[in-house]
């Protein structure tokens, strides 16, 4: 338990009696996910004392943060990244997406399992494994986790120069990222791989958290629903700002279905550049359209990997254009 002066109030709060008993582990998360246990605010506050002012008692006599507050969520992420991944500096500009780290970690771990399934059950690790993060954003979450857990090398792309500027600062301030994360701007907002992948460039996997709304209004309506569930309807006048996310992060023409369908079509022109192309799919109703696009693109193999965080279910779709013989040759050469 914390004992030094600034946390005295927090210490008293965290020892309140009649606290609600919560499960010790979050259900559904990947077995290797470092965030399976409930947030240990004692430990997080030691790693990142800046978190302490954002801690407050809940109605159940527990300690937490206000998850409707972008500053509180950002500070929680900063503490998690420092405590679990050794990231000394991490910051994002106002209004940029501040992603939930446990869910992002699940994607990385399931992606590792996907690679292992093609490598005799052994997860390929180290700098020989190259991963392309489409839409790395200002937060660099996937490269941070992938580098720390598996030693992978990343290229992160984004169309927003402000996001890349913030990401470059994170890289420059953390030695573990300097030689393992390369950042590239996608200058054509209609392209995904074109202009990024060189002819002879090879990636073992791609990952992407696509913009899933079809308009700014749809994104705002979703955020209002989230705020209402948190009992924060009074702050819904500025919905996007409360949860974070620039327009390019939250929505695009055609929404999730349109974006991933374009990704599938473009990936077919880069069939030999990557072993597994993958993308998160937030809406289950999007899947039939994506499967149709993959059939049209003549993908050799398609997998859907389900993930869960409590009652929330998500998934990512993975596809490859490599034949079994080409997959075996890739494994022998790179892993």
Swiss-Prot record:
Membrane-spanning residues: none
Reactions accelerated catalytically: adenosine(1618) in 23S rRNA + S-adenosyl-L-methionine = N(6)-methyladenosine(1618) in 23S rRNA + S-adenosyl-L-homocysteine + H(+)
Gene Ontology BP term (one): rRNA base methylation
InterPro entries (UniProt xref): METTL16/RlmF (IPR010286), rRNA_lsu_MeTfrase_F (IPR016909), SAM-dependent_MTases_sf (IPR029063)
Keywords, in A-Z order: Cytoplasm, Methyltransferase, rRNA processing, S-adenosyl-L-methionine, Transferase
The enzyme's E.C. designation: 2.1.1.181
Main location: cytoplasm
Keyword Transcription regulation: no
Record's subcellular location: Cytoplasm
Keyword Transmembrane helix (UniProt): no
GO cellular component terms, A-Z: cytoplasm
Family according to the record: Belongs to the methyltransferase superfamily. METTL16/RlmF family.
Name of the featured protein: Ribosomal RNA large subunit methyltransferase F
Record gene name: rlmF
